[in-house]
């Protein structure tokens, strides 16, 4: 598996994991929900990158995805196809 494939798989696992954890939480309000999503994403980024030197430089870029992830999860009501589309759009390595 080359670096591009590894990074794509990493992003997909990260966002799918975030979405699964999001569904387990109580959603009291948009603000609380987004704050919790950002905490979850921060934790997942750290867990996925802490032992992987190849992905350490991606942390800043992944953290910039937090707000976007919150927005599209809310906007599209957790639609799986939209999530996959957003992963492809977010990752510059998947553009043709």
UniProtKB/Swiss-Prot annotation:
GO cellular component: host cell mitochondrion
Compartment annotation: Host cytoplasm; Host mitochondrion
The entry's keywords: Host cytoplasm, Host mitochondrion
Keyword Acetylation: no
Quaternary state and interactors: Interacts with NSP2 and NSP5.
Family according to the record: Belongs to the rotavirus A NSP6 family.
Name of the featured protein: Non-structural protein 6
Species of the source: Rotavirus A (isolate RVA/Human/Belgium/B4106/2000/G3P11[14])
């Amino acid at each position: 598996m080359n670096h591009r494939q590894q990074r794509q798989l990493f992003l997909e696992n990260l966002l799918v994991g975030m979405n699964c954890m999001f569904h387990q939480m109580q959603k009291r309000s948009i603000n609380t929900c987004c704050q919790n999503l950002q905490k979850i994403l921060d934790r997942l980024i750290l867990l996925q990158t802490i032992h992987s030197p190849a992905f350490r430089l991606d942390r800043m870029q992944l953290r910039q995805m937090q707000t976007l992830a919150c927005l599209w999860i809310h906007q599209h009501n957790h639609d799986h196809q939209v999530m996959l589309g957003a992963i492809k759009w977010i990752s510059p390595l998947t553009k043709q």
